[in-house]
Amino acid sequence: MGVNSYSEQIDIDNTYRLRMLISTLPPYAKDYFRGIQPHTESRTRIAYAYDLNVFFSYLHENNPIFAQKEIRDITLDDLEKLRPTDIEEYLEYLQAYTNPQNEGSNNTKTNHELGLKRKLASLRSFYRYFIQHEDIMYNPVDLVTMPKVHDKAITRLDIDEVALLLDQAESGDKLSEREQRFHDRTKLRDVALLTLMLGTGIRVSECVGLNIDDVDFKNDGIRIHRKGGKEVVVYFGDEVESALLSYIEERKKTEAVAGHEEALFLSLQKKRISVRAVEKLVKKY
């Protein structure tokens, strides 16, 4: 696998996921996603597709005009008949709803300010594409006020809290009995990963995407692949260098699963560690 293999594989996986999601939407949705591809990330298109799936499912299940229609049979002419009040009712619905396509005991979905704003933005983008291509002449979403997102206080760790977090990762004192059984096998990895993120401010997604040869000890920097394929070097200090050196000595002795040989941080399954696993790791300590 090459230097860009992780990000490239994510895009490939997202392409297949997007195709699957588009297959559940009306045929003209394919034109929209093809149109926005040059200026959006694959993850953004996936998010928009999920949002549109929720919207069309809502119309089918809750709007009497569309009750007799399958989702794929809803036309652009149908969408042009909607009014701002229909969109406002949809936003109210999004605050708490159940997904009819996913039966189960824990099936209630909720959206607060940020989630409502994103879903309205997805729908607005969808309508505007067809307005620009003169397939429709009326966009009810533009007449709906975007939900206001109230700023939240940013939680930052002070120096003592950072030191305590790293101490706990090294000692494992606060872990459950079950977690402590795995601690010796993951301690160097966890300390290196946390020290790197705290010491450089890189994102979790950037951290899990690192390969071994992205680390440059000669210049004390790591090569990061950011959105749009942009490559940057982020420099680190002595504490990060020490933690990485200790971990990499152990990492070199680990034979990774085929296809994950170049990954810097591995899971216990000897595969590239996932974003979700890192989030659980941080929560654990």
List where the protein language model places each region:
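Conserved catalytic core of the tyrosine transesterase superfamily
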Residues: 1-285
